[in-house]
Design a protein with these regions (language model features):
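N-terminal membrane topogenic signal
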Residues: 1-11, 62, 242
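Hydrophobic, membrane-inserted alpha-helices
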Residues: 11-17, 68-77, 189-198, 255
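Short, hydrophobic transmembrane alpha-helix segments
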Residues: 15-29, 261-265
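Alpha-helical transmembrane segments and their membrane-interface exit regions
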Residues: 35-45, 92-104, 213-224, 276-282
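C-terminal ends of transmembrane helices
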Residues: 43-53, 97-110, 169-181, 224-229, ...
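Membrane-interface helix-loop-helix junctions at boundaries between adjacent transmembrane segments
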Residues: 55-62, 74-133, 141-151
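Alpha-helical transmembrane segments of multi-pass integral membrane proteins
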Residues: 93-97, 102, 118-138, 157-173, ...
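Membrane-water interface signatures at transmembrane helix termini and the short loops
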Residues: 183-223
Length: 300
């Protein structure tokens, strides 16, 4: 996993290089390409993951698993339509926890289960509020398009400061109880500084793409392939892609239809993030279950 993280850091600096050479429009196009490939791909094999988890516990019928999964996605879509403020709030919370869990789970910090979950959520919220505070105009526009609620910069600032304070308390607590993690914490603080630079100089979509793909999706793909097939190599990765391909294509077709119906940028961004949210809810639950299962399987 450390090699994967190092690759992600190198790719992030390559993303900064793109920012310095190309226009904002190019960043947006490239960002969507990355999201529609690696980003969608990393969440396209949830059904297979559920099957792998079931194989290790109790086998669940495929149609039952698929029905529950689609019902969860459908419920998220309906919630976004009728209760957009609630849906967006839940999306941010689920995404924050999901990002934090993926980023920290492999570190083996030996924290209590409750503290770990709180820390994952707070770290993920810190990343998201950093993204929001450094791209306020675009964020305010997208939130207004989704919810018809108009935020201002102060709302984003207060959310960031509150999250930063909570993160500081968590880090201090970890260092007091587990001083052996000092090098890990210092490295993570440096990586957060890198994110600040990336988010500051990039457009919202490109900044989100860099984090979502290089820092989240690629490490997640590694974890998923290793969990399903027991190893990560060229053969297992292609098996993963082959299994994910039908779900990936369906997702792309859905996004393409939405784009051709709503070509207005703001509306499309709103629908795009709503779509990401709809698949995030079940995906986050599946990944949490995967990590829980790995803890009970020493060979994983």
């Amino acid at each position: 996993m450390n090699k994967i993280i190092n690759i992600s850091i190198v790719l992030s600096f390559a993303g900064l290089w793109v920012t310095s050479l190309f226009s904002g429009d190019f960043e947006i196009v490239l960002g969507f390409i990355l999201i529609f490939t690696f980003g969608i791909l990393h969440g396209s094999n949830d059904i297979l993951l559920i099957g792998s988890i079931s194989d290790k516990t109790v086998k669940q019928p495929f149609l039952r698993v698929l029905s529950i999964y689609l019902l969860t996605v459908g419920l998220a879509v309906v919630t976004f339509y009728f209760l957009p403020v609630l849906a967006l709030s839940l999306f941010i919370v689920f995404s924050a926890f999901h990002f934090g869990e993926q980023h920290w789970e492999h570190q083996n910090l030996n924290l209590s289960d409750t503290f770990s979950k709180a820390f994952y959520l707070i770290y993920g919220m810190l990343v998201l509020t950093l993204l929001f505070i450094l791209n306020p105009n675009d964020v305010i526009e997208v939130v207004a398009a989704i919810t018809s609620v108009t935020l201002n910069y102060d709302h984003l600032l207060y959310a960031f400061l509150f999250t930063l304070a909570a993160f500081g308390i968590c880090v201090a607590s970890i260092l007091i109880k587990h001083n052996e993690h000092q090098s890990v914490i210092l490295k993570e603080l440096f990586l957060l500084l890198v994110l600040v630079i990336i988010f500051k100089v990039s457009t919202l979509i490109w900044a989100f793409a860099i984090y979502f793909i290089f820092w989240h999706s690629i490490p997640s793909l590694f974890e998923q392939v290793q969990f399903i097939y027991g190893t990560f190599d060229k053969s297992s990765f292609w098996k993963y892609c082959k299994n994910a391909f039908p779900y990936w294509m369906i997702s792309l077709m859905g996004i393409a239809i939405v784009y051709f119906i709503f070509k207005d940028n703001t509306i499309f961004y709103a629908l795009f993030f709503s779509f990401i949210a709809a698949v995030t809810f079940p995906h986050a639950l599946v990944i949490t279950k995967m990590f829980s299962n790995k803890k009970t399987q020493p060979n994983q």
